[in-house]
Amino acid sequence: MHIVVCIKQVPDSAQIRVHPVTNTIMRQGVPTIINPYDLFALEAALALRDQHGGEVTVLTMGPPSAEDSLRKALTFGADRAVLLTDRFFAGSDTLATTYALATAVRKIGETFGAPDIVFTGKQTIDGDTAQVGPGIAKRLGLLQLTYVAKIANVDLAGRSIQVERRSEGGVQVLQTRLPCLITMLEATNEIRRGAMADALRAARAEVVIWSAKDAGVEDISKCGLRGSPTIVKRVFAPSARAEKATMVDFSETAPADALIAEIFKRQPKLEDDLAALARGY
């Protein structure tokens, strides 16, 4: 079984700052992490490999520094890491990103064996579009299962997979045939900690580095800014709203009544709405 996991190196959202003049994200000096949803995808892939055998290849597109995230993925237990890096990819939106990553997945299949499953996180915390996974699936002609919370069963002999997909109405149990692409939500499985042996192996491992040409990209005009029909015009931090807090004296004999009275004082329409609702019953 061969599984490809697409990951992304993103700025730590807890430490992101927005430039006050340019309104762009200030990445200098901000620590980077593996996109959290991608970690759940990686854990799901590693669990399947442990159960069924095979290999897990992690793939990322980014600057040379993204190799750090790939080595972290190797520490978790991935078997192989591929870095897709080239100046032609700079400024890619989701359309250009899916073109480059889909091309790289094809190259991985030609070089290391066709993948049975391609995993991504449901979205990245820096872009929040949730478009890259489905876009890769479309370009590769793969069936896709999105917003998956749990891998329920894999039948390699029957070439099928069953998953639990979270939806607004509850949980859907879906089954499809392999190969397919899966985007993962926060999973119930705890993300494993890499063993010391894995950390040593990751430090010595050779990361496969591909340029656009190495990966087989045929049309550079579909990459980077040239291949991106959308651009981020402005990023800004929402202004903080000052809310006045009222302390309710819970030493009163009826603290709940005092709290409700204060709420109705602030939201008089709420009292009328509740009264109308009560009359309806």
Swiss-Prot record:
Keywords: Electron transport, Nitrogen fixation, Transport. GO terms for biological process: nitrogen fixation. It comes from the Bacteria. Belongs to the ETF beta-subunit/FixA family. PANTHER family: ELECTRON TRANSFER FLAVOPROTEIN BETA-SUBUNIT, PROTEIN FIXA. The keyword Nucleus does not apply. It comes from Azorhizobium caulinodans (strain ATCC 43989 / DSM 5975 / JCM 20966 / LMG 6465 / NBRC 14845 / NCIMB 13405 / ORS 571). FixA and FixB form a heterodimer. GO terms for molecular function: electron transfer activity. Transmembrane segments: none annotated. Pfam families: ETF. May play a role in a redox process involved in nitrogen fixation. This is Protein FixA. The gene is fixA.
